[in-house]
């Protein structure tokens, strides 16, 4: 019987990875042994502090494996009421005797309405955790909180994932042990010679063997880091995951603004061992094709790539159709030229950079048709693709008027949409937003409404702010929109407005229906597709049955 009991506990130990915190609490009540050996250690192992509760469902396991400490679950709530619940739950966490069980702790940004009191409480929590020095991953996304706790953070010896801000972050690197993940955030004016001395470089090469590196440069010139690494003859021969950002800016006289160049990059990183690559990039300079040249120079070396992410970043040409189309051409040409792309690529993420209100330049319908045909040519070749992540696809599509009108007037005719779409039509007819370029209020049109909707849905996943490739490792937050805010939205004085957060859930369902034709196409051309996330709408796909369903909407 002892062996049988041991086998049962092994099974439960593995199965508990898929249980959410409510299930783990239920499991802890079954027996003292189950409580002490499985439920409690698993419950405290990975804690994520979020402003809003996460969406729950029995259809998926995104909320499994983590304990979420969150605010008030209600459609209608105020910031101070949410603070009360979140503050109390963090205090209860501080009082527990199980803090030593915490191996991973993630603290999101802007958690509290009362920021000063919230930061004091969070600093207490971080101090307690760092004093124990057993944590393996401490992700503090609020820069102010990180600065308050940075001295203790950098002295932690057990971290497997590390974040470095600015110049002094590497000072204690000799004390670090066994870290396999590094996120380095560089200030624009950082002098690399003062930071990466040769012994630091040697330590990075050793520790990141088989690991991941993310470089986030405030100047959007991450390639300068690899040029400096090359000057020190540093070589990363076995990186598995890499993320960087680089923009060749229009009319920028900054010394840190530079063309995308692959020379040093290819010498420093052994691209043939990369499994995951995420690039935030663009070239905004007229008659320059450095982004295309860069990608074509590296594509032949990426023989092991299974996960690929692209993020468009623009400064002076946000919303310019021809900028977006050029970027799409560069990205899709790169994808087509990847070695064994049909056999190897499993995950693809593409995020565009649309304007807040969706209004762009040259966004006529024929231009979008060209962009759609481009993706229709490339996507069918990705026959092994299992996951598609497109965080801004709603805004990208509906910035073209015909498609925005389809959403409201010519789209889904089901009973649900037929009931609610006229209400949102009435919203549009009675609300305005403030246009800064025009210096006056303008009527909300379908393009603007769809863009605000996409931005609101993005709040489900935007607090994660790490890799887009990892967005499906987090449960989406239960967020809403009150149909005001953004660009000073207001309604006409003669109109009695009844739109608030309670109207958002039907709108999310309407958006999920809007994506049905796109999902019908994707499951037809991608035989191994299993999941997609389109602008905060999550779909699960059955490749065997060629069917799909929305998870939360």
From Swiss-Prot:
Keywords: Cytoplasm, Cytoplasmic vesicle, Membrane, Nucleus. Induction: Expression is RSF1 and RSF2 dependent. One of its GO terms (cellular component) is cytoplasm. It is a peripheral membrane protein. One of its GO terms (molecular function) is GTPase inhibitor activity. The keyword Cytoplasm applies. GO terms for biological process: endocytosis; protein targeting to vacuole. It is found in: Cytoplasm; Nucleus; Cytoplasmic vesicle membrane. Residues 3-49 form the F-box domain. It comes from the Eukaryota. Interacts with SKP1 and YPT32; SKP1 is required for the interaction with YPT32. Non-SCF-type F-box protein involved in the endocytic with the vacuolar sorting pathway. Acts as a repressor of YPT52 by inhibiting the formation of active, GTP-bound, YPT52. Involved in the defense mechanism against methylmercury toxicity. Present with 3080 molecules/cell in log phase SD medium. The F-box domain is required for interaction with SKP1 and defense against methylmercury toxicity. This is Non-SCF-type F-box protein ROY1.
